[in-house]
Amino acid sequence: MTVPQAQPEINEPSPAMIGLIDDERIKNAESEPGNWLAYGRTYEEQRFSPLTQINKSNVADLGVAWYKDMGTNRALESTPIVVDDIMFFTTSWSRVYAVSALTGEELWFYDPKVPREWGRRACCDVVNRGVAVYKGKVYVASLDGRLIALNAATGEKVWEVDTITDRDRFYTITGAPRVANGKVFIGNGGAEYGVRGYVTAYDAENGDQVWRFFTVPGDPALPFENPQMEMAAKTWKGGEWWKVGGGGTVWNSIVYDPDFNQLYLGVGNGSPWTRVIRSPGGGDNLFLSSIVALDADTGAYKWHYQTTPGDNWDYTAVQDMALADMEVDGVDRKVLLQAPKNGFFYVLDRSDGELLRANPFATVTWASEVDLVTGRPVENPELDYTENAKWVLPGPLGAHNWQAMSVDVDAGLVYLPAQDNPLIYEMVDTWKETGIYKRNPGGWNTGLEFGRITQILLDNFDEQPTPKGYLKAFDPLTGEDRWVIEIPHYWNGGVLGTSGGLVFHGDALGMFTAYDKENGEILWQYNTYTSMLAPPITFEAEGVQYVSILTGTGGGDLFSGEPLPPVAEHASLTYNNSGRLLVFKLGGAVELSVPNHRDRSIPAQDLTQVNDSAIARGELHYNEYCGFCHGLVVRSGGAIADLRQMNDATHEVFNQIVIDGIYGSKGMAGFADVLTPSQADDIHQFVRARANQDREVSLGNMKPELAQLTWQ
């Protein structure tokens, strides 16, 4: 549903004029600040807008100009592209929309028809972070690994190419393509499922492959693709990493640097996460958790910097990178800025990768510091979890994830969504008992014990650091905070800064807020009634400045489920996970209706077939295969169906859903390749038992602290 205000007269552009973004236009984006031409607005990806019509003096008058219901309750993570009064963006399942930026009127819609069963292959939801627009085409990468070029005027497909090298492996794509020099660049995800990462460049005109760069070495018995892979293989020792994939996927940040004609890749975690399994002889495991610079035209290696040598915690370096010119220690430098998962904020010289700064921006316990001489972190040996479980900060969601930051070069600050979100790491039981790790081709491959995760958490609950989120103004050179806003939930949205003196941010509580960039004071706030992950953008159309944001949570936090301890104000749990595009302007007067509270009642459970041994077995299988979407202890986080609320009809066909995949067309694929009907029965009994416990609590028949969470 689109609800505009009184619609201005629109001068429709001719089809030949739509989407005509080229390299020069992006390089000179500052000359047309009303457009948002690229993923991070410019090639530098600072996500800081020079627009000032909306500013500190009048932001209190901001209101909804129009909105569009997107018809999904899955997470929305897209950064829209706005050019010449047309907005291009994506939603779940890689669907693409082109709408009028003034009214929200839909111009065209494209559905790549991703098989819904492919959702099982995605570690972290069926999300998509956006498109690239270039020379009259719109480029989108689909969840199932296709790169598709669309006519920007009509949405018709121009060409399509399969980017996946091995379709027996669980590759996915959720990231936005980047464009430069007549090429489209795209990576992929899937490290948890045992894949080998790479980035490919395609000809933007016809989709022909130009070059491909692998981020980790393959089988050393085979010829290496280039000298860098031969060099990297020497840093993997004692294991058969190529059989479990190795990881190193580039699932988010790819940045083009016109100053050096370089392409920077943000490389992900190892597969499995645990290095003692992946590379038992030690080694840095290049290029995991690294920033890699390539020649943008040829894909030739230039330099790299590894943020977390021998990654052991899922500390990706795929988080957004920004480029800037800054004075560092009295010298003008062209720098790259990144706040990856590991909790240190890196400032690198873009010419050669020299480390200039590495200051912690959140609570970090895995390392004491980064040695600026060696460039390496100083690990904390007391948190080695090879023998015993250890709480570590950050956990695998990181001190900062993919949610965008904003770089204010003039102020020397970064407006950063950060988090303290720990995990207790413990080696998988089978490896501890036998010293042998068996890859699971149909599930996650972390090397950690997830089957018993609830019991492990409860056994160590008193030692758990408190999870929380932050929005902060951070000085990357000094490591100091200018100001900090604490947010009760850790999983919040991206950030936009503007020359109007404002910082915009959406959070898990459903609040879209404008802060004073000088001191963090709240100047304006709007309740969207839906938790947010996506970054805001701002643009100008017909002389009017707008601010927009997509609503809807999910993504990598699906496994955490309902927050523990509870966060009463969590919007998508309180109301619904309503996917919307909201667009604001000064004087906007469209009103959103206040939604009803979500029905969270749990039906009575049939416990006649339930027994403790079946429940205990079911818990292990649930945590291995179901919990990553449906939530820890069967408590959904709001984006995926809450299994405690299944009705009698769904209970009747439970095994047909889980084994046969009768809901495959809805995104719930079958698991016959990894589960037996008997094991599905056990999962069913665990779900019933957990539902019954929480129902008794909700009826006041049991104190919350007495609810049984585990049967291990």
Identify the meaning behind each predicted range.
Residues V3-A16, H597-A616, L620-E624, K666-Q712:
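Flexible coil segments in periplasmic/lumen-exposed cytochrome c-class electron-transfer proteins
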Residues Q7-V64, P220-M229, R376-N380, D459-F461, ...:
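Blade/loop signatures of beta-propeller domains
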Residues W36-G40, N73-R95, R120-R146, T172-Y193, ...:
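Repeat-blade elements of multi-bladed beta-propeller folds
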Residues K68-T79, F109-A132, E160-A176, F214-S253, ...:
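Extracytoplasmic beta-rich repeat domains
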Residues I186-Y198, G238, L265-N285, D420-Q464, ...:
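Short, conserved, GDST-rich strand-edge loop motifs in beta-rich repeat architectures
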Residues I537-D599:
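Blade-level signature of beta-propeller repeat domains, shared across WD40, Kelch, NHL, RCC1
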Residues L592-A614, G627-M646:
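His/Cys-centered metal/cofactor-coordination and adjacent catalytic loops
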Residues E619, G631-G664, A669-F671:
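Gly/Gly-Pro-rich "capping" loops immediately C-terminal to redox-active cysteine motifs
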